Amino acid sequence: MKPLRYTASALALGLALMANAQAVTTIPFWHSMEGELGKEVDSLAQRFNAENPDYKIVPTYKGNYEQNLSAGIAAFRTGNAPAILQVYEVGTATMMASKAIKPVYDVFKEAGIQFDESQFVPTVSGYYSDSKTGHLLSQPFNSSTPVLYYNKDAFKKAGLDPKQPPKTWQDLADYAAKLKASGMKCGYASGWQGWIQLENFSAWNGLPFASKNNGFDGTDAVLEFNKPEQVKHIAMLEEMNKKGDFSYVGRKDESTEKFYNGDCAMTTASSGSLANIREYAKFNYGVGMMPYDADAKDAPQNAIIGGASLWVMQGKDKETYTGVAKFLDFLAKPENAAEWHQKTGYLPITKAAYDLTREQGFYEKNPGADIATRQMLNKPPLPFTKGLRLGNMPQIRVIVDEELESVWTGKKTPQQALDTAVERGNQLLRRFEKSTKS
C-alpha cells in the first residue's frame, strides 16, 4: 500500500502542476520588428513574463507593417486575432474604422489599472488619440522620425567636415556629388520615400500634405502634396538621380543596409534604424537632422512621427485584457521605455523616459541620439504638421511609391507624377469617406 500512496501523491502533485500551468494566460502579440529590434521585443516580453508568472506574452513576427496589418484584420474576421497588434502610424484611421479594436483607455479602466495618458509626449499621443474625447485609442510604442545618417570616414575622404552634416537639401545635393566623385558607389539614398520625401518634407518645411489639417478635421480631406514646393524638391532628387548622386534602392528600409555595408555615404532613414546601424556599421558614422529646403519660410518646423503603436483587439476575455493592461503598463514604465529608446533609436514615448535618459548621461555619451526627439519638439506643431489621419493611407503610400518610381525611371516628370498620385489617392479617400458613412 505504501508504494500506492506514493503513486497517488505523485499523481496529485502532477495534476496540481498541470492545473497551475493551465492557469497561465497566454497573450499573443503580433509585430513587425525584425533583426536587432525583434530581439529587443523578445527581451521585453521575457522580462514581463518573469515578473508576471500568471501571464505569458508571446511575440510573433508577422512580416512588415503592411503584412502584419493585413494579417491582423484577416485574423479578426475569422475570430483568431492576436490580443495585441502592432500597426504603423498610417494605419491609424483604418484601425479606428475597423470595429476590431478595444480602446486602450477602456482596457486599463476595466482592468482597474491607473493609466495616466498625460505621461506620453503630446506630439506622439496626439497621433493616436480620439479627436472627440482626447483619449488614447492605442498605446504609442516604437515612434520615430526620419534622421540623416552619414559616413564620417567617407566625409573625410571627400574633403568634407565630418562634424558638419548637410543642413539643407541644397547642401545635401552638393555633398552627394563630392562623395560620389571621391569613389563612393552611392552618394545618397533614402528609405521610406513617401514618408520622408513627401510626408515629412511637407511638415518639416511647414507645408500641408492634405486639407482638413491632414485629415484630422474630417474624412472629406483631399491630398495637397503636388504644390510647387514639393514638385521642386522631387525635381531636385530627379536631377541628382540622373547624375548618379542619388540612388533609389527600394520602397522601405533598404537604404539602411546600403548605408551600414558602406555602399551609400548618406541616407535619410528612420531613427529606429539606429539599432541595426550600431550593430553592423564598420566605420565612424554620425546622425544629423533631416535637411530642410533653404527657400522655405520659417523652416525647419517640426517632424511628424513614423513607427507604430500597439492596438488591443476585440473579442478577448477579461483575464486576457487584464494581462494586456499589465503589459502595456510595463512598457510605459520609465526604466523600460528609456531602455527601449536607448537600445533602438526610437523616440522616448514618455516624458519620464526622456528625463531618465538625459539624467543617465546617455545623450552625452551618444552624440546624435537625441536628434529625433529634438526634431519632433523643434517647434510647436501647426494644425497641419502634427501628423496624418487619412483613410486608406497604406494604399496611398503604395501609389506614391509607384509614381515616384516613374520619376526615377524617367517615365514621368515630377509634376505629372505628383498630380497623378494626388488624383489616385483622392479616389481612395473618397472610397474611405463613403465607407465610414454607410
Swiss-Prot record:
Family note: Belongs to the bacterial solute-binding protein 1 family.
Binding annotation for sn-glycerol 3-phosphate: 65, 89, 144, 270, 307, 346, 397
Keywords: Periplasm, Signal, Transport
Its job: Part of the ABC transporter complex UgpBAEC involved in sn-glycerol-3-phosphate (G3P) import. Binds G3P.
An example Gene Ontology CC term for this record: outer membrane-bounded periplasmic space
Signal sequence segment: 1-23
Name recorded for this polypeptide: sn-glycerol-3-phosphate-binding periplasmic protein UgpB
CDD domains found in the cross-reference section: PBP2_UgpB
Source organism, top-level taxon: Bacteria
